[in-house]
Structures are given as structure tokens and as C-alpha cells.
Design a protein with these regions (language model features):
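Short S/T/G/P-rich N-terminal loop/turn motif that feeds into the first structured element of a domain
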Residues: 1-50, 54-69, 77-95
Length: 95
């Protein structure tokens, strides 16, 4: 079952997003293994990212092997604080 992850960064900016995504995605046009979609944009008080993964396990693999280690090392110009996170089992996904 597909698995969704929403990260909200209060006070986050487009510039911080660009620096962070460059550090954790394989390239500007490629998603990490197991990720189906990625959308991001400004929200009322910061920056919000929503990703859908093939399974909860593919999310956890990306989180544990790539995302968290790189964020803990510090990403130059990236988000200064960890995100507020919510997750969900995807009931329906449409193109």
C-alpha cells in the first residue's frame, strides 16, 4: 500500500528547500528509490512537502538511510529545524 508523508517547516523558504532537496534526492529530475511522487510549495507560515512512497517500508528506508543522516550532518543553506511530520496510508491516488 502506498504511504504518504507530509513535512511542514515553519518559517521555511524556497531557498532552504532547494538546498535540502539537492542534498537528499539523486538528482533534480529523479526521485529516490521507492518514491512515487513529490510535491512542495510555500504554505501559510513556511514550506510544506508531501511525498508518496510505494510502501511504508520504502519511506522508512529513505528516511533512515538518506534523509535523517544528511539532515543530522547539517545541510548548508537547508532547513534549520526538523519538520512537523504527519503520515498516512494512501487510500486513493489520481494522476
Amino acid at each position: 500500500m502506498a504511504y504518504g508523508v507530509v513535512h511542514h517547516f515553519p518559517g521555511g523558504t524556497k531557498e532552504q528547500y532547494e538546498a535540502s532537496i539537492a542534498a537528499v534526492h539523486p538528482s533534480a529530475d529523479t526521485l529516490p528509490d521507492g518514491q512515487i511522487s513529490h510535491v512542495a510549495g510555500p504554505s501559510a507560515d513556511g514550506w510544506t512537502i508531501t511525498a508518496v512512497h510505494e510502501t511504508q517500508e520504502s519511506w522508512e528506508r529513505f528516511r533512515d538511510d538518506i534523509l535523517m543522516p544528511r539532515m543530522q550532518q547539517g545541510i548548508d543553506g537547508g532547513f534549520a529545524t526538523p519538520p512537523e511530520e504527519s503520515t498516512f496510508d494512501v487510500y486513493k491516488s489520481m494522476p
